[in-house]
């Protein structure tokens, strides 16, 4: 009976189902994880470029940033911080090198963001949005070649900086009331 009343799975839903496995999470939720399975997997490492970025520009930007000054006095980051973020490619961590990005692995991006967050929530948001909620990922998957060639280099360099807009109490989903 239930099969006759359930809606058919859409192509998008089927792709999501087929996209991968639960990997280690399945072991945890089994109630009796086989720790040897986890230990057999190689520990993820950074590329030389990623490690150099963490040791160099990430440390430098953390030293340059004063969260108290930015959030309570200036209500913005100093222009030298903005310029440094653009010059060192912080906005292009997920963008492929062929478009001017850094093409970092997710582990490197997460580590960069964790380190920056330890110093400044504002700076973390400014760098994090373009590398997560920004349009680069959408352009890479769904953009035309012309859109990618035009927009991705501008996003990677910081010439164009995307934003994330959340709706308010009188429009859209009213996120604060959820």
Predicted regions and their residues:
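Extended, charge-enriched "interface" segments that sit outside catalytic cores
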Residues: 1-76, 80
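Glycine-rich flavin
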Residues: 69-178
